[in-house]
Each structure stands twice: as C-alpha cells, then as structure tokens.
C-alpha cells in the first residue's frame, strides 16, 4: 500500500516538475539548459515509476522496490540540483506568480520525495530481514 502511495506521489512530482520545465523553456540562459535536463529527468523518473507500479505485487517486488527507490533517489537528487541552479536566476525574473509558486511547490515535493526514496531504500530491506528471521515460524507439530 505504501509503495503505491510512494509511486503515486512520485508521478505527481514528475508531472509538476514537467510543468516547471516546460515553463522554464520559455526563458533563455540557464532556464533552457535546466529545463531540458528536468524534462529528461521527468521522463526517466516517470518510466521507473511506471515500472514500479506495474511490478509492485510481483514475486520480485522487494528487489524492484529497492532498485526503483535507489534510481528515483538519484533522479530526485539531480532534479533538486536543477532547481537550485534555476533558483539562482529566479530572482531576476519579474513574471507571473504561478511560475514562482509552482517552482516552490515542485522544489518542496522533490525534496520530500528524495527523503522518502532514501528512507524506502534503507527501511524496506531491513523490514524484510527482520520479518524473515524473527517472524512467526510455522511448525508441523499437530499437538500445538
């Protein structure tokens, strides 16, 4: 259940970041380069998220979850770096409030998803190992 929520929030982050990237392509200089990089990262992240959503209930779901969360961690980290580069030039633009607010919310969501990716990639294997070795064991003793 948490994995579906994680992947859904990831997809929302990629859609919002794509809106920011398309809007950034209207401006020149740093925004064009970072906008193209954000679009590439959005497509990569959306593909990984779609793969995670399709394989969330499969036999190898633990491996898929860990690999997808590590890949998404790298993608969100790069998106955060692009947002930092764009924030340096953002103060010189006197444009719409929508641009600035969508940028702020996209940055916050990317940071939240970066933290969630890190937590998920670390906690899921630990939870699996604890459950595997210390979970309830079935016995074949008919007296119990």
Give the residues covered by each predicted segment.
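N-terminal signal-anchor transmembrane alpha-helix
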Residues: 1-47
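Alpha-helical membrane-associated segments of multi-pass integral membrane proteins
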Residues: 10-15, 91-135
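Canonical alpha-helical transmembrane segments
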Residues: 41-64
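Transmembrane helix-loop junctions and nearby membrane-interface residues
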Residues: 18-28, 50-56, 76-86, 125-128, ...
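Hydrophobic alpha-helical membrane-insertion segments
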Residues: 61-83
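Interfacial non-cytosolic loop connecting adjacent transmembrane helices
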Residues: 26-39, 76-112
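Helical transmembrane-bundle signal
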Residues: 13-21, 45-49, 71-75, 117-124
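Short, charged juxtamembrane terminal tails flanking transmembrane helices
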Residues: 1-2, 132-144
């Amino acid at each position: 259940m948490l994995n579906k929520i994680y992947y859904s929030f990831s997809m929302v982050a990629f859609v919002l970041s794509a809106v920011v990237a398309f809007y950034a392509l209207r401006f020149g200089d740093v925004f064009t380069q970072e906008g193209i990089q954000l679009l590439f990262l959005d497509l990569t992240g959306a593909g990984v998220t779609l793969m995670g959503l399709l394989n969330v209930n499969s036999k190898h779901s633990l491996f898929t979850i860990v690999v997808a969360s590590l890949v998404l961690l790298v993608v969100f980290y790069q998106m955060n770096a692009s947002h930092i580069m764009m924030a340096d030039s953002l103060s010189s633009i006197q444009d719409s409030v929508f641009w600035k607010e969508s940028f702020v919310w996209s940055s916050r969501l990317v940071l939240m998803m970066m933290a969630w990716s890190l937590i998920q990639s670390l906690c899921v294997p630990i939870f699996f190992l604890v459950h595997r070795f210390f979970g309830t064991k079935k016995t074949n003793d008919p007296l119990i």
